[in-house]
Structure formats: structure tokens, C-alpha cells
Amino acid sequence: MEAPVTVLKRPGPEVETSARRYLEQVGIGDKCDAYPAQLSGGQQQRAAIARALCMEPEALLFDEPTSALDPELEQEVIRVIKDLAAEGRTMLLVTHDMKLAADVSNHVIFLHRGLIEEQGAPKTVFDAPKSDRLRQFLSSTVAA
């Protein structure tokens, strides 16, 4: 965990303690000494989340955190994201998983061609979409 030591000037033992705590929090405390190649895709994603948390960020950015995972591993990462949301962490989540977005968001922004097409509370956006494009997108994700 070089970043917190170098960037934040935190003492190594303190960083190691927080790293172990965050690895436990994301459910891979038993993998403290594992190399990335020894971890599954879901474990690698959760290790990345733990690394980010060690920097004590004000906000976390997730860019399609579950897109390359099989369904079982996907659920592991979703559980961690839901737990972080329940803690009140600020997160910006880019995803095509509308169920995840609805479950963890307090504000949703739907982009089309790089522009904001629609935004608001998840219930409003998902239950009563105003734009044809969002309605089309939601119907295609429900059918999939």
C-alpha cells in the first residue's frame, strides 16, 4: 500500500492496519498476502475497492464495476457497493445495471450520446421515464 504512505504521508504500520480492515470489510481479509493473479475477477474488484478506501476518499468512482464478471462474482461486488451505500459513502456509479443503480442511488442520471437525457430520484426516473430513449433502454434491459 504505497499510495497512502507516499501521497498521504501516513505511517506504514497504520496503512497496513487500515488495508487489512478494508480487505475484511470487502470480504477478502483472507487474501492479504495473495498476488493479483491468484484472485478471481470479483476478488480483484473488491481488492481495488479496498485500495481506494485506504486513501480515505470523499467520493468513490465506479466505472462498470460488474461488467466483466460472471453472475456469481458480480453478486460479491454488488454486495460491497450496497454496503458502502448503506454507510452513506458518496459514490459515482457508471453502470448499465439498472437494478443496481435503483438499489444504491439517491440520484440517477441517464446519458444518451454523452448528454444528460434525464435525471432525478431513482423511483421517478425508472418508474415514470419522460424520454422515449430512456423508455426504450429500460424496456431492452428488462427483456434481457
Please place each PLM-identified region on the residue numbering.
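A short, surface-exposed alpha-helical micro-motif characterized by mixed small hydrophobic
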Residues: 101-103
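H-loop/switch region of ABC-family ATPase nucleotide-binding domains
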Residues: 95-96
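Catalytic Walker B motif of ABC-type/P-loop ATPase nucleotide-binding domains
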Residues: 60-63
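Helix N-cap at the start of a conserved alpha-helix in ABC-type nucleotide-binding domains
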Residues: 71-73
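Conserved ABC ATPase signature
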Residues: 35-39, 43
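A short, proline-enriched helix->beta-strand linker immediately N-terminal to the Walker B motif
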Residues: 54-58
